């Protein structure tokens, strides 16, 4: 009955654990090549996974904190942002959580700012591929690369990530603590955007999604031999 239920699914998407899935595929391939009696039923053909209906998962924001401003003064950084964004200072004491796509919050020097991508730029992105309209890609293209000289978020130690489950107060705490210069709050990627990227055979940018619910941490051993 379970097999029949899964056979009726048109698609299954890997939402989290891409590297582990790829590693499991490589292990399977190696074992299959060494096993002359390979049947496809051996334990190395399988790995543990949990499936959720897309209607029962949430994608939270995945925010950024920045070590420095690439040598810029705060005023110069804000001026650089104004080339591609409408920049508006927030109300004192109120955090800026983005409420729509192409909107960002910036916490710097004790103040919050709301950044909105300029309309002409947002319109031009509609003709590009599925990843171009993602807010994490917009942040990379118009803030991190040209202004801060951060080109690879996975390897650059000048940027770190804070899951939305920890709230915007965690961003303030990290910046006010003195170890970081600024924080960027990001609008959460929609499920529809994620599926659109996957269906077009593209790859989501790094640290673009924070999924909930998450399974409890633990250790399970899968013996292959």
Name these PLM-found stretches.
Residues 1-225:
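Surface-exposed, charge/polar-rich loops and edge strands
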């Amino acid at each position: 009955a379970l097999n029949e239920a899964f056979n009726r699914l048109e698609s299954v998407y890997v939402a989290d654990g891409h590297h582990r899935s790829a590693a499991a595929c490589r292990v399977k391939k190696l074992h299959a090549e060494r096993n002359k009696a390979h049947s496809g039923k051996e334990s190395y053909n399988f790995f543990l996974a949990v499936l959720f209906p897309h209607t029962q998962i949430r994608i939270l924001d995945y925010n950024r904190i920045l070590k420095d401003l690439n040598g810029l003064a705060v005023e110069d950084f804000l001026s650089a942002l104004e080339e591609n964004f409408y920049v508006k200072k927030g109300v004192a004491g109120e955090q800026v959580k983005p409420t729509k796509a192409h909107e960002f919050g910036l916490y710097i020097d004790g103040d919050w700012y709301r950044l909105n991508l300029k309309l002409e730029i947002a319109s031009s992105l509609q003709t590009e591929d599925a990843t171009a309209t993602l807010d994490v890609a917009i942040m990379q293209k118009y803030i991190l690369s040209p202004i801060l000289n951060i080109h690879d978020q996975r390897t650059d130690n000048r940027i770190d990530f804070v899951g939305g489950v920890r709230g915007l107060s965690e961003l303030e705490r990290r910046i006010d603590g003195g170890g970081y210069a600024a924080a960027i709050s990001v609008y959460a990627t929609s499920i529809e955007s994620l599926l659109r990227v996957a269906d077009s055979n593209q790859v989501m940018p790094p640290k673009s999604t924070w999924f909930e619910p998450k399974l409890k941490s633990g250790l399970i051993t899968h013996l292959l031999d």
